[in-house]
């Protein structure tokens, strides 16, 4: 190890001066109220059995009543308690749909919308021709639809799961959005309907973070004049019980962050422990994935620090050595690194050791999975290095060359593979081989994340000195303005979303729980980067969500 790399001699570093954490030590200590947890637990079990009875009873009802009840369970965030029962009902519905499609012609607009959306969100390929009945003889949407606010909202949410070559859904999105905006501005609506419309126009359900959307809907459902009080109370208790677990997990990761010295030794990097855990919670929030969440939460923090090391501190020589060391991933290589990088490299190795222990303790020894995660880490390091070299050389690459690298450096491929590690029962070797091939769904997820990130961050990164974002690359190559480039980016985002939706309903050998991880990663983009770079500047976009998820329980 040369003295030069360990010294603080004059070196030009592209310092970013990121904002400090909003949260301080808020999450580093968590004292669970065991008495309240016990009280909640007893009532939760009692209510769960009653809700399960209601769900089983609904099998004798009409399809419209079945799908409406499932919709309510999912919107309230309690469907994780009844996964098998719900899947059984949906399978029956889809089977009946395939044989007797005439019954759908009698669905009202609200029922048709939730029927289509929910079946697609569970991986069933239901065709968009079910909406043909909404058109008149002039191929326009029937005028009477404009009077049905809750039906229009249901159709609007259904359009969000559209895939390619579904023109009627593209048209329905334009139609419903215009009508809902008009209704919200001019009509006198009940609070129950008004809140749903106002929220949906900002955040579509399909593209939202599931746990965040459930918290919001619980408050909305309280104002439903036809609400089921038992179901409402069950959803509140369930939310608070699961929140206790999430608080405990965030506390664990906060302590790990402190003990790892990443915050104190890598002062140039973003301290975003709570924000990283929000990303983790979007990938999977269900209690059964708690061990997997702890590992993924640590990884996302480490990748954030690694990204900032390449972008906002490391010299060319340092990042080249770090990239080379990452290709080996052995402790003997640590001495080649400058002191500050040793902290980061140690965190990487310690995390992989922790993962290996957890995998070896599963019902079947799944340590083979480690090789896939390591390869993705090596790949992302090479992409970071390439971007650093571009920056040092003031090189603006052709857009497609930039994008090919950037959809890897955004980290979704590594996150997908890592999220599979802790899914003992459903993630067989085929799942890792699938992710390894960079399939269309994963690549499109990366495009959504990268393109919206670039749109929201490119001006700031240009000011502080950073590799050219996709916006600059596209502007230079095509000779267009920033505004024109942004329009093109959002067209590509819409196209990539259709890819994700299409792949989700395309039959393959993967369990739907695995595909949901990719879908959930795509959803992050629509929340974090909707109005600004919410990860770098979380106080406006993410602070409210973090308070709702990790600080404030639902009032009961």
Swiss-Prot record:
Keyword Lyase appears in the UniProt entry: yes
Motif (DDXXD motif): 307-311
Positions that bind Mg(2+) 2: 307, 311
Signal peptide, first to last residue: none
Residues at which Mg(2+) 3 binds: 453, 457, 461
One GO BP: diterpenoid biosynthetic process
Protein purpose: Catalyzes the conversion of (2E,6E)-farnesyl diphosphate (FPP) into drimenol, a precursor of the sesquiterpenoid polygodial. Polygodial has been shown to be an antifeedant for a number of herbivorous insects.
Entry comment, domain topic: The Asp-Asp-Xaa-Xaa-Asp/Glu (DDXXD/E) motif is important for the catalytic activity, presumably through binding to Mg(2+).
Protein name: (-)-drimenol synthase
Species of the source: Valeriana officinalis (Valerian)
Lineage: Eukaryota, Viridiplantae, Streptophyta, Embryophyta, Tracheophyta
């Amino acid at each position: 190890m040369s003295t030069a790399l360990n010294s603080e001699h004059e070196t030009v570093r592209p310092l970013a001066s990121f904002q400090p954490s909003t949260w301080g030590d808020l999450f580093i200590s968590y004292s669970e109220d065991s008495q309240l947890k016990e009280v909640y637990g007893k009532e939760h079990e009692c209510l769960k059995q009653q809700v399960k009875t209601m769900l089983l009873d609904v099998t004798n009802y009409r399809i419209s009543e079945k799908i409406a009840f499932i919709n309510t369970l999912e919107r309230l965030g309690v469907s994780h308690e009844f996964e098998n029962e719900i899947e059984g009902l949906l399978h029956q519905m889809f089977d009946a749909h395939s044989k007797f499609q005439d019954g759908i012609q009698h669905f009202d607009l609200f029922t048709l919308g939730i029927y289509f959306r929910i079946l697609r969100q569970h991986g069933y390929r239901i065709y968009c021709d079910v909406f043909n009945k909404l058109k008149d003889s002039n191929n326009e949407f029937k005028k009477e639809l404009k009077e049905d606010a809750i039906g229009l909202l249901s159709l609007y949410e259904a359009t969000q799961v559209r895939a390619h070559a579904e023109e009627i859904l593209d048209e329905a999105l334009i139609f419903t959005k215009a009508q809902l905006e008009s209704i919200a501005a001019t009509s006198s609506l009940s609070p129950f309907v008004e809140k749903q419309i106002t929220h949906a126009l900002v955040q579509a359900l399909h593209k939202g973070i599931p746990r965040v959307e459930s918290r919001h809907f619980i408050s909305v459902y309280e104002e439903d004049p036809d609400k089921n009080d038992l179901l409402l109370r069950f959803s509140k208790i369930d939310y608070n019980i699961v929140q206790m677990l999430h608080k405990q997990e965030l506390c664990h990761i906060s302590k790990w962050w402190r003990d790892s010295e990443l915050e104190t030794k890598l002062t140039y990097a973003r301290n975003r422990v709570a924000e990283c855990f929000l990303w983790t919670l979007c990938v999977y929030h269900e209690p059964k994935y708690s061990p997997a969440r702890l590992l993924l939460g640590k990884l996302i923090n480490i990748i954030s620090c690694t990204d900032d090391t390449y972008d906002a501190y490391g010299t060319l020589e340092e990042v080249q050595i770090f990239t080379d060391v990452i290709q080996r991933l052995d402790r003997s290589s640590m001495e080649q690194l400058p002191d500050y990088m040793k902290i980061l490299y140690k965190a990487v190795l310690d995390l992989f050791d922790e993962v290996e222990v957890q995998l070896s303790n599963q019902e079947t020894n799944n340590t083979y999975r480690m090789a896939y995660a390591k390869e993705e880490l090596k790949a992302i390091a090479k992409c970071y290095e390439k971007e650093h070299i571009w920056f040092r050389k003031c090189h603006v690459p052709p857009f497609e060359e930039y994008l090919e690298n950037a959809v890897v450096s955004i980290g979704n491929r590594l996150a997908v593979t890592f999220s599979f590690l802790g899914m003992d029962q459903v993630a067989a070797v085929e799942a890792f081989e699938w992710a390894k091939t960079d399939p269309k769904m994963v690549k499109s997820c990366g495009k959504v994340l990268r393109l919206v990130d670039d749109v929201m961050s490119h001006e700031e990164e240009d000011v502080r000195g950073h590799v050219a974002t996709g916006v600059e690359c596209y502007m230079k190559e095509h000779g267009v303005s920033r505004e024109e480039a942004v329009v093109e980016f959002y067209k590509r985002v819409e196209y990539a979303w259709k890819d994700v939706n299409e792949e989700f309903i395309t039959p393959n050998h993967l369990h739907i729980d695995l595909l949901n991880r990719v879908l959930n990663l795509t959803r992050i983009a629509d929340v974090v980067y909707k109005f600004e770079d919410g990860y770098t500047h979380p106080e406006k976009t993410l602070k409210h969500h973090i308070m709702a998820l990790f600080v404030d329980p639902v009032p009961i």
